[in-house]
Amino acid sequence: FVNQHLXGSHLVEALYLVXGERGFFYTPKAGIVEQXXASVXSLYQLENYXN
């Protein structure tokens, strides 16, 4: 898994992969779309959204 632009279902899949059973949260003001879809995101950045 390399750093890449993630949006839509690809972003959700990556969050499930990274967060696992902990799940993840989404709040529109958190900037997940801007961070992951508009620019390259790392696994570490995605893990910040895991519960």
Swiss-Prot record:
- SMART domains annotated for this entry? IlGF (SM00078)
Q: Keywords of this protein's UniProt record, alphabetized? A: Carbohydrate metabolism, Glucose metabolism, Sugar transport, Transport
Cite the CDD domains for this sequence: IlGF_insulin_like
Gene Ontology MF: a single term? hormone activity
Q: In which tissues is it expressed?
A: Expressed in seed coats and pods.
Q: Which domain of life is it from?
A: Eukaryota
The record's listing under InterPro entries reads: Insulin (IPR004825), Insulin-like (IPR016179)
The record's Gene Ontology cellular component field reads: extracellular space
Single Gene Ontology BP annotation = glucose metabolic process
Q: What does this protein do?
A: May be involved in the transport of sugars to the developing embryo in the fruit. May also be involved in signaling events.
Family, similarity comment: Belongs to the insulin family.
What this protein is called in its record is Insulin-like protein
